[in-house]
Amino acid sequence: PSTASPSIRSSRVPPAGPVANESTQLYYCGAGAQGIDLTLDFAAFASHMIQVMDGEGRLVYRAPINLNSGEKNAMTTEIRQLEPQPIWIHFADLNAVPRPSKKEARVIEFMKSFGEELGLETLVDDIGNVIIRKPATPGMEDRTPVVIQGHLDMVCQKNADTDFDFDNQGIEMYVDGDWVRARGTTLGADNGIGVAAAMAILASDDIAHPPIEALFTIDEETGMTGAMNLAGGVLQGGIMLNLDTEDDDEITIGCAGGVDVNISGRYEEAPVKPGSVAFTLTVKGLSGGHSGMDIHRGRGNANKLLARVLLTAVESHGIGIAAIDAGGLRNAIPREGSAVITVDASDVEAFKRFLAEQAAVLKTEYATTDPQLAVTLEAAELPAQVMDERFQGQLLRAVRACPHGIHRMSPDVDDLVQTSNNVARVLAREGEYQAQCLTRGSVDSEKMDLAEAIRATFELIGADVRLEGAYPGWAPRPDAPIVKLMGALYEELFGAEAPLMACHAGLECGILGSNYPEMQMISFGPNIRGAHSPDEKVQISSVQKFWGYLLETLQRIPPR
């Protein structure tokens, strides 16, 4: 069958779990076609895939499956029927495969099988990047080879009340008007939609294109180790189309670099004061978002707000702090943070009134950017020890003093954040503490200066501070032929001036460009909102616009 998702009727009910070396005969009748005998290989269930072969052993259908949830399958069917169908089918397939950053083994194998089953040259390098090459369509062999690039991993964030295992479950998606969302988790449209678009082109037999080299990198979200470890000389293309921009009204031609500021140390503990009771104090409900693309929106940082409340409570009520667990991923603005605290039993009611006042102040300050902000207090088991009084004040003051948000706007590019910092993680328990910041900047010297200032802040309290994982920015080349081509094409297709821009986020183009300095690069994509948070969503109509723009670009790539 030529359709990507044929209707299949089984002659008997599939088994409840994986069964090796067992198959059943199926009968498929396509529209206007004779029925053909097919074989369903249940051994493939071990990898949560369904494979349908024809009588000569040729693969005619392959897709992820979930044997345990008809509701989930129904939702996936709804996604697969969206237009442009080639993208949504592959996005549904991809989102059925767990792919957390640094745990990409299954999605690497999935992509490797995808390329090999298409009969395309497929490579997996030592770090796990997947490269799939497809020859040009007839008549376009002389065109400049194009690298289509995206990353396989996704940010894994979920709401506190969502029971979900990113290591073993596929994303549960649903349609909400003109948007596709996930249920209580990140969606993985960043960068799953870009990967799906590349897959659709590789799998097509009716899309005109030059020689294609699809590069699927790993670990973009937590270190860009895939891009950093891609060897020079591997790629053969002269133009790179990065599909990791999150706004269809932006064509990205430059980006910021970044550096991790990793902080750690030890502290003394002291016995809990007699007559104390324990609580878990939590700041939650913040909007979060991408620590680069959303840093200018002024949203609250749970780590900073928690430190603010705790320090005020230490000074006014003499609370003890047994543990802090706040924030998470380095590239996500923290949405939640909590601390286990001790309060004198005689002061509990006064402390609750104090906390209500603090919550009211924060809700007023962040009413527009974080309308769901909440400060809660729940009873907890009394710990045996708390932080030394002197140190807890030092740690909280250091977190409060550490800059978060915009450090400097670009004096040259309107509305571009030039340098920023995200206080991403604060963890303290049992005499040890850690913190992490991600400092971004399009001017490397200024970026490193801000990181050094953060280092100095925490070294004042005796912390060990390491600046690690620095990666370069991507300098704009507005006169590059691909920029001019896509700029003119944008105006032709959409009747508006091409929105060329640089972004305050770390795209892999900066790193890849350091090994391929002559390669022309550009980045674009559909509208994705709320990336790196459970509010992530991708706009259906925007995916249609993006797909048309991508296909028209491929048709117009000039001769090499």
Task: Please tell me what each predicted stretch does.
Residues 1-14, 23, 47:
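Low-acidity, Ser/Thr- and Arg-rich intrinsically disordered low-complexity segments
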Residues 76-178:
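Acidic/His- and Gly-rich active-site-bordering loop/insert found
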Residues 84-87, 411, 418-431, 438, ...:
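Zn-dependent metallopeptidase/amidohydrolase metal-coordination segment
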Residues 92, 96, 340, 374-386, ...:
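A short beta-alpha structural unit
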Residues 140-222, 227-238, 275-278, 389-392, ...:
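Active-site metal-coordination/substrate-binding segment of hydrolases
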Residues 212-302, 310, 314:
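Fold-level recognition of mixed alpha/beta catalytic cores in primary-metabolism enzymes, strongest
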Residues 233, 299-316, 343, 347-348, ...:
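His/Asp/Glu-rich mid-to-C-terminal helical/loop segments that flank catalytic regions of hydrolases
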Residues 254, 271-276, 295-325, 345-420, ...:
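Acidic-enriched catalytic cores of C-N bond-cleaving enzymes acting on peptides and small amides
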